[in-house]
């Protein structure tokens, strides 16, 4: 049995049998069975050699074990004439040749069962002593493959320690290399003392970009805090604290890290940015990603803020007003303003000549009447504005003139708002436009009964009151018509007159004789929120206080000059709900309040100019502690005492007045919430009537439409307020801010205009659903219920629009109050405004809260 033991070598089945030692074993096995062969009377028939066809469980491993062995071959094995085993192909094909009896042959289970069993035992022993099996080698292969994968991932994964997004070389755009020339730094506008900063000698090497706290802060803003993307590329603090100061604090092009030029940084959150020309300061430009208010810790006192909260170019200093100067490298052509460069291709020649005159006339009568203080106002057009969407008026580009060093330092002759209520005193003005008793209604596609339903709603909600629209000009036809959403066009035609919104008479900021008084101080645009519009502070005393503070502390000029539109942005609702119906729904509450206080304002129309928010001049300046602020008890018309001549005293007085105005705005907000609850009860009653008159499927369609209508109205109003905010900021930043901010505002405007196109499709879809619901209600409900339905749609839109506008006013007023408190040193967050006694906190409104 030693010959059947496992061998050290693995022989091929087709190899020679010279090393096999089965001679004696085969002879003994054959002799043991020879008796059976002899008894049969004939020679034993030869069977076919074992193969996979006859014995599929036999493979060549078995043959290797049976024919293999460690023992040396006998000397006469080479002379043996026994045939060698054939390959697998030969074993499977054809009959085998006859072999000489007595020689060892292939094993057969039927012929030699004992030898077959012994060979099986030898095979089992050989398998037990074999090296590692194939599964072990497969596991080793998997380990090697995993190691290779780890190496590949380590080479191609995102390097978080660098915090930089890299693009492949084939996709990376080539950035033009800037010459490493020394750029002299002029006096920084953010440092009124005029201290120059040392010039940097060369641009940073490509491999060393992004080192230091500046790049780390930038990466933190870009990747960790996307909401602070507005600060990338703009100044707003000391040197190396804000990114704009690292390159240039006053518009100077200078060396900057490589991250500023990296395209992936500018494309963060799908915000694609086109880089500015080489003669203008380069930097990252971003879009609005939510809140536009920057942290107060990064806003110095000498920086200005626009209406939307962005940091504007510094133009004020301790020595007075500093004109904006853009330095240009030697040999480079003096660049035009970015606003002119960007918009010149959108403007006709006539409007471009008006927007960019060669020299502003200083002695013309029209200029002297339009000019307030040192502010020059010229009309402008916005880029790529769809005429079929906005039938409003173009913004006014305010161009500041250098301050007059010989200007009088005394109290200025201010131009204040008229104390006449809205709708009174307009009959004496030329160019008055009066709408007849019944409003012209929009014709919506639908059934005849549906159109009659819209026209019949006038008798149920009280639209029969006459309305006076704002005249297109003053007695001298010098002041253009102001529209609250921020656009100016030519005088409207008769077909477009119903789309224009009424504006209060005092929004023009004229006194009783319609003649603006001369002033040598910078006038603040208040009231309508339009850039360059006349100030409409509640009283002359408050206006003089604001102008005096703006003269003493120019850093407060822009925060106090910002003002949202006095009327909700209803332009995007046109086509969904008739605007005349929406405005009429604002008027019933206006009539009730007007009977009580006819000389103040109309809250329902929501076109108040803060006149109603303050009591008499003596009462509005009174505080709880007269000893602490004794100056506030003095009448506004008299001169201020000596303690209040300081800047701090004036700021305290203005903060007290703004706090009172904020409390009154919260009171108005509670009134709107009560009105919203009343409309919700009307909707529930109407839904009960629809449940009784219509099928369950139609009732479900009506309920879904009313819920979707509130959401769509909120989105449209939010988009309209953002568009108006960006246009106001763009008009204010047209001439006195850096090009980076202007480009950012233009980009944001284009993004909002694309969203406006999407909103138009959504509005058309909801309008189709409204027409389908109205057709069902016309067949099922009586005329009175149809009027209630039409009034409900207009009332919901009116309440939502007023809530949106009131939120804008409260937020802006709170920002102004925070800015004054920061200057006073109160860095702690301001507490919630105190509410009048007997009032409770506002409850959850029945309408969904509008997005901010």
Swiss-Prot record:
Transmembrane residue ranges: none
Keywords assigned: Acetylation, Actin-binding, Cytoplasm, Cytoskeleton, Microtubule, Phosphoprotein
Domain ASD2: 543-825
One biological process term in Gene Ontology: actin filament bundle assembly
List of residues that carry Phosphothreonine: 103
Compartments, as annotated in UniProt: Cytoplasm, Cytoskeleton
Source domain of life: Eukaryota
InterPro entries, A to Z: ASD1_dom, ASD2_dom, Shroom_fam
Region (Disordered), start-end ranges: 34-54, 81-109, 125-218, 276-320, 399-431, 464-496, 823-852
Comp. bias regions, Low complexity: 125-144, 301-313
Residues bearing PTM N-acetylmethionine: 1
Gene Ontology MF terms in the entry: actin filament binding; myosin II binding
Biased composition (Pro residues): 830-852
Main location: cytoplasm
Residue stretches making up the ASD1 domain: 145-233
PROSITE patterns xrefs: ASD1 (PS51306), ASD2 (PS51307)
Keyword RNA-binding: no
Keyword Cytoplasm: yes
Stretches with biased composition (Basic and acidic residues): 152-164
Polar residues: compositionally biased ranges: 279-289, 465-479
Quaternary structure (record): Interacts with F-actin.
PANTHER family to which the protein is assigned, alphabetical: APICAL PROTEIN/SHROOM-RELATED, PROTEIN SHROOM1
Domain notes: The ASD1 domain mediates F-actin binding.
Name this protein carries in UniProt: Protein Shroom1
Organism: Homo sapiens
Lineage start: Eukaryota, Metazoa, Chordata, Craniata, Vertebrata
Gene expressing this chain: SHROOM1
